[in-house]
From Swiss-Prot:
This is Olfactory receptor-like protein I9. Glycans are attached at residue 5. The lineage of its organism: Eukaryota, Metazoa, Chordata, Craniata, Vertebrata. Keywords: Cell membrane, Disulfide bond, G-protein coupled receptor, Glycoprotein, Membrane, Olfaction, Receptor, Sensory transduction, Transducer, Transmembrane, Transmembrane helix. The keyword Transcription regulation does not apply. Belongs to the G-protein coupled receptor 1 family. GO terms for cellular component: plasma membrane. Residues 51-57, 121-139, 220-236, 293-314 are cytoplasmic. It is found in: Cell membrane. Coiled coil: none annotated. Residues 1-25, 80-100, 159-196, 261-272 are extracellular. Disulfide bonds join 97-189. PROSITE patterns: G_PROTEIN_RECEP_F1_1, G_PROTEIN_RECEP_F1_2. Olfactory epithelium. It comes from Rattus norvegicus.
Length: 314
């Protein structure tokens, strides 16, 4: 019966967000504003880095790729969510669901690896400033970016192919606002052991190890700065690491809690809210925390704005 159901299924029904109907328009406006902010913030970063030659450095190479990953990561789920919030029967085609899983994993993993590269870049810049250019050579930076893209491609493809092997009952209802992998496993009609094993085995090198490397990098940064005891050095340590670590902890904390350490007590509402944190909030905050507060980015933006204003006075 599962084989018949698997071939017959053409779409999934999404329950969406657990909000009262009377607040639907309010949350629609809120999520639309958040999505547009995410698009605008990340597009500004990418354009500025492309146009300003002074930003053609290792750190901004990683930043531009991270902005692209965040922009696409948010676009994987947000447009469909906004569309379904205006639909009487929120659904997603079977092929669209698999595509959403693939790109969700791809851009999520890509941002994950880029955060590690950025943490390492800051570590070298602060702890080994005299050797920064020799260590962070263009060849190494490009290699790190290419490696990130390659690893994410294979990881996302593996999980997508494993999901495609599963059988689903007709009229399958997903208690989520997108095709979340862990939620799909709960509604599958066939054995999900291989999928769960792949998540557990690959979760370490893909999620936990990068998180630990980021923590170690920032810990070394703080330790290096504290070797020169002064109020200025302490302020520099917190300004350099505090805001970055808060977003990193928010992203990794929710991902690890949802996928690597799932609890039987986790309700659908709790899982949905946790998912909102890393699918909406983190991509929106990253441009402000990593780039828009940066003096180089502000200078580049001011130069472009001045160039556009000068012809109007001529």
């Amino acid at each position: 019966m599962t084989r018949r159901n698997q071939t017959a299924i053409s779409q999934f029904f999404l329950l969406g967000l657990p909000f009262p109907p009377e607040y639907q328009h309010l949350f629609y406006a809120l999520f639309l504003a958040m999505y547009l902010t995410t698009l605008l913030g990340n597009l500004i970063i990418i354009i500025l880095i492309l146009l300003d030659s002074h930003l053609h450095t290792p750190m901004y190479l990683f930043l531009s790729n991270l902005s692209f990953a965040d922009l696409c990561f948010s676009s994987v789920t947000m447009p469909k969510l906004l569309q379904n919030m205006q639909s009487q029967v929120p659904s997603i085609p079977y092929a669209g669901c698999l595509a959403q899983i693939y790109f969700f994993l791809f851009f999520g993993d890509l941002g994950n690896f880029l955060l590690v590269a950025m943490a390492y870049d800051r570590y070298v810049a602060i702890c080994f400033p005299l050797h920064y250019m020799s260590i962070m050579s263009p060849k190494l930076c490009v290699s790190l970016v290419v490696l990130s893209w390659v690893l994410t491609t294979f990881h996302a493809m593996l999980h997508t192919l494993l999901m495609a092997r599963l059988s689903f009952c007709e009229d399958s209802v997903i208690p989520h606002y997108f095709c979340d992998m862990s939620t799909l496993l709960k509604v599958a009609c066939s054995d999900t052991h291989d999928n769960e094993l792949a998540i557990f085995i690959l979760g370490g090198p893909i999620v936990v190890l990068p998180f630990l490397l980021i923590i170690v990098s920032y810990a070394r940064i703080v330790s290096s700065i504290f070797k020169v005891p002064s109020s200025q050095s302490i302020h520099k340590a917190f300004s350099t690491c505090g805001s970055h670590l808060s977003v990193v902890s928010l992203f990794y904390g929710t991902v690890i809690g949802l996928y690597l350490c799932p609890s039987a007590n986790n309700s659908t509402v709790k899982e949905t809210v946790m998912s909102l944190m890393y699918t909406m909030v983190t991509p929106m905050l990253n441009p402000f925390i990593y780039s828009l507060r940066n003096r180089d980015i502000k200078d580049a933006l001011e130069k472009i704005m001045c160039k556009k204003q000068i012809p109007s006075f001529l």
